[in-house]
UniProtKB/Swiss-Prot annotation:
UniProt name for this protein: Probable xyloglucan endotransglucosylase/hydrolase
Pfam families tied to this protein: Glyco_hydro_16, XET_C
Organism taxonomic ancestry: Eukaryota, Viridiplantae, Streptophyta, Embryophyta, Tracheophyta
Glycosylation sites: N114
Cellular compartments annotated: Secreted, Cell wall; Secreted, Extracellular space, Apoplast
Active-site residues from the entry: E106, E110
Alphabetized PROSITE patterns for the sequence: GH16_1, GH16_2
Binding residue positions for xyloglucan: E110, Q123, T124, N125, D133, R134, E135, D199, W200, G204, R279
Gene Ontology biological-process annotations: cell wall biogenesis; cell wall organization; xyloglucan metabolic process
Domain GH16 as annotated: residue spans: 23-220
Its EC number(s): 2.4.1.207
Family: Belongs to the glycosyl hydrolase 16 family. XTH group 1 subfamily.
Keywords on record: Apoplast, Cell wall, Cell wall biogenesis/degradation, Disulfide bond, Glycoprotein, Glycosidase, Hydrolase, Secreted, Signal, Transferase
Length: 293
């Protein structure tokens, strides 16, 4: 009887382990200058609390931005952001990874400004080998201008997962077997910027930036970077397979995370390129891996 019970417990444990996934590790908050440097219009960057908080300012003359000191192949990257409040129509606050060549890879968070009282739109996109056009858009389920919220990317050989706080909002699976290029051999820097894009950002460019409301300010803190640092010319991570994000529990979402993703898709998604039959005659191959399409 004891042997039978022990065998049963072993089977149950094996089944549970096969289904285990995990949330990314808790980010470590650090000062801005540990990982980042300004890229342009440094006079429009304001440092608060010894550089643990940074405010980007946009006016009619210029926006501004910053980038990481290093480039990375895979990892976990997050930022706490408080978006531009009030009438932010025409503005874009961006947090993204990008390589530096013509056939570039890129992983985007873009926050599209709104008229006062209208919800913010978060647009995500993935470029691989210079090909993008993979936009998805959601309405955020909270006011992102009232407090800081975490926006993060988990990028490994198996998937690119986008998170808002602890909620997954998008998963882009490695579909190399379907003939789809996947970002895996181009180190990327992280960037963030605040800029004017009133030719397209709000209602397709119909809503213009009201410069009487300037300056527009977006605030940042956290500055978490946990990645495999590599030169821009590197094609692989020297510790590939040994990092925490390479382990089996981080190769897919778990059941609870997929339920949260399904909730985002059902309640908050307003555009998904995978279902845009007017724009695309045939569904992109990688969309076959999207559970909610």
């Amino acid at each position: 009887m004891k042997a039978t019970a022990g065998a049963l417990l072993a089977v149950v444990a094996a089944v549970l382990l096969r289904g285990v996934a995990a949330a990314p590790r808790k980010p470590v908050d650090v000062p801005f200058d540990k990982n980042y440097v300004p890229t342009w219009a440094q006079d429009h960057i304001h440092y608060v609390n010894g550089g643990r908080e940074v405010q980007l300012s946009l006016d009619k003359t210029t926006g501004t931005g910053f980038q990481t000191r290093g480039s990375y192949l895979f990892g976990h990257f997050s930022m706490h952001i408080k978006l531009v409040g009030g009438d932010s129509a025409g503005t874009v606050t961006a947090f993204y990874l990008s390589s530096q060549n013509s056939e570039h890879d890129e992983i985007d968070f873009e926050f599209l400004g709104n008229r006062t009282g209208q919800p913010y739109i978060l647009q995500t996109n993935v470029f691989s080998g210079g090909k993008g056009d993979r936009e998805q858009r959601i309405y955020l389920w909270f006011d992102p201008t009232k407090d800081y919220h975490s926006y993060s990317v988990l990028w490994n050989l198996y998937m690119i997962a986008f998170f808002v706080d602890d909620t997954p909002i998008r998963v882009f699976k490695n579909s190399k077997d379907l003939g789809v290029r996947y970002p895996f051999d181009q180190p990327m820097k992280l960037y963030s910027s605040l800029w004017n894009a009133d030719d397209w950002a709000t209602r397709g460019g119909r809503e213009k930036t009201d410069w009487s409301k300037a300056p527009f300010v977006a605030s940042y803190r956290g500055f978490h970077v946990d990645g495999c640092e590599a030169s821009a010319e590197a094609k692989f991570c020297a510790t590939q397979g040994a990092r925490w994000w390479d382990q089996p529990e981080f190769q897919d979402l778990d059941a609870a995370q997929y339920r949260r993703l399904a909730w985002v898709r059902k309640e908050h998604t307003i555009y998904n390129y995978c279902t845009d039959h007017d724009r695309y005659a045939a569904m992109a191959p990688e969309c076959k891996r999207d559970r909610d399409v």
